[in-house]
Regions:
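Catalytic machinery of carbohydrate-active enzymes
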Residues: 1-331
Length: 331
C-alpha cells in the first residue's frame, strides 16, 4: 500500500488483553500512513479503547451475523459486507483462519492487499505477543515499531463517529465518551487493585488480598479503587467490607473506556495476569503484576513502569510482604 492512498482495516477479535497487545499495530500504521483512514473491525466494548486513544478513526462491530458466511467455502456472501470490504486498500486480519477460507472470501470481493496475521502468538517461538503481532507489518516495510502498547486517552470530539455495523453509517453520539464523573483523583491518592482474572488459577488467594488491604490501610494514606467485572463475582463486595467506606470505592462492570479514565487518575495498580493489567500498563501506570504459570516471556504486560512479582511456588508463593515491599519501592 502506498502512503496516503485508500483506507486501512484491521480485524481483531479476542479478549481485552488480546486487543491491548495489538495497540502497537495501530500505532505503527498511524506512523507509517499518516492521514490515512484507519478502521478496526472488532468488539466495540473493547476496541473502543483504540478510538478513545485516537489510534483508529472508526470502530466497526465484528458481531454482524452475516460475517459468518465469510467462513464458509463457496457460500453466498452478504452484499453489504462485500461492499464494505471492497472499500479498503489494505486489510490486516488477526482472525483464526487456519484454512484461509476467510481470506479467500474477502479477496473474492475486495482488491485490497490482504495480510493475515496470527490470532495468537506461537508459544514455541517464545516471542512476546506484541512483537508476534507486529511481524506481519514487515510486508509494509515497518521494521522499527515500538512494541510497547501505549494508550493516551483523548476527550471525544463533538459528534464523533465511532461504533457502527459494517456497511452502515456510523451513528452520531455513538463514541464512548469521557465520563462526566471522573473525580477519583480529586479526593487524595488512589491505588487501583484488580483481585481477579479470567481464570481462578491466575488469582492470588483472597485472604492475601484482605491482609494486603488491611496493611496498606494502616501504613499508607492511599484510597483504594477495587476493579472487576462478572468474573470477580462477589469478591469485590467481600473485600470492600474490610475497609471504611471513606477509603474504598468499587469500579465493577464499568464500560472499558470509562474504567480506563478512572485508572488513569490512580497513582498505581496491583493486579494479576489479566487484560486489566495490560490496560493499566498501556495507560502508563506504575504497576505490580502478581504472576503465576503463564509464559511471562510472551504474555507479560509491557510497560515502562510495570514490575512482575512471581515465585517458584506459583502465584500462591507470592507473599503479602513481597507486595508491600513492591508498593513501597514503586508507589
Amino acid at each position: 500500500m502506498r502512503q496516503g492512498r485508500g483506507k486501512i482495516l484491521v480485524i481483531r477479535g479476542g479478549a481485552i488483553g488480546d486487543f491491548i497487545v495489538t495497540l502497537p499495530v495501530f500505532a505503527a500504521l498511524r506512523r507509517q500512513f499518516p492521514g490515512t483512514h484507519l478502521e478496526v473491525l472488532g468488539y466495540p466494548h473493547i476496541a473502543g479503547l483504540a478510538a478513545a486513544g485516537r489510534l483508529v478513526d472508526t470502530v466497526c462491530s465484528i458481531e454482524a451475523r452475516a460475517l459468518a458466511g465469510f467462513f464458509a467455502r463457496g457460500g453466498g456472501l452478504d452484499e453489504r459486507l462485500a461492499n464494505y470490504f471492497a472499500g479498503f486498500a489494505l486489510i490486516i486480519s488477526f482472525l483464526f483462519d487456519p484454512d484461509g477460507i476467510f481470506q479467500e472470501n474477502v479477496t473474492r470481493c475486495s482488491k485490497a492487499q490482504f495480510i493475515a496475521g496470527p490470532h495468537r502468538p506461537d508459544e514455541k517461538l517464545n516471542l512476546h505477543a506484541t512483537e508476534a503481532l507486529l511481524k506481519p507489518l514487515e510486508r509494509l516495510t515497518i521494521f522499527d515499531a515500538d512494541p510497547v502498547p501505549r494508550l493516551k486517552l483523548v476527550a471525544p470530539a463533538a459528534g464523533g463517529h465511532v461504533a457502527r455495523q459494517p456497511g452502515r453509517e456510523a451513528a452520531r453520539g455513538s463514541e464512548a465518551s469521557e465520563p462526566a464523573d471522573k473525580d477519583v483523583g480529586a479526593t487524595g491518592r488512589w491505588l487501583a487493585l484488580h483481585p481477579g482474572s479470567g481464570s481462578e488459577r491466575k488469582n492470588w488467594p483472597e485472604e492475601n488480598w484482605i491482609y494486603l488491604l488491611q496493611h496498606l490501610h494502616r501504613a499508607t494514606k492511599f484510597n483504594f479503587l477495587l476493579v472487576g467485572g462478572e468474573a470477580e463475582g462477589d469478591r469485590l463486595q467481600r473485600l470492600s467490607t474490610v475497609l471504611p467506606t471513606t477509603r474504598i470505592q468499587l469500579a465493577q462492570s464499568l464500560p472499558l473506556v470509562e474504567l480506563a479514565w478512572q485508572l488513569r487518575q490512580c497513582a498505581g495498580f496491583i493486579g494479576h495476569d489479566s487484560g486489566i493489567s495490560h490496560l493499566a500498563a498501556a495507560l502508563g501506570l506504575p504497576g505490580l503484576v502478581l504472576w503465576g504459570e503463564t509464559n511471562q516471556a510472551i504474555w507479560c504486560p509491557r510497560g515502562d513502569r510495570i514490575t512482575v512479582l512471581t515465585s517458584n511456588g506459583g502465584i500462591a508463593g507470592v507473599t503479602v510482604g513481597d507486595v508491600v515491599a513492591g508498593v513501597r519501592s514503586r508507589f
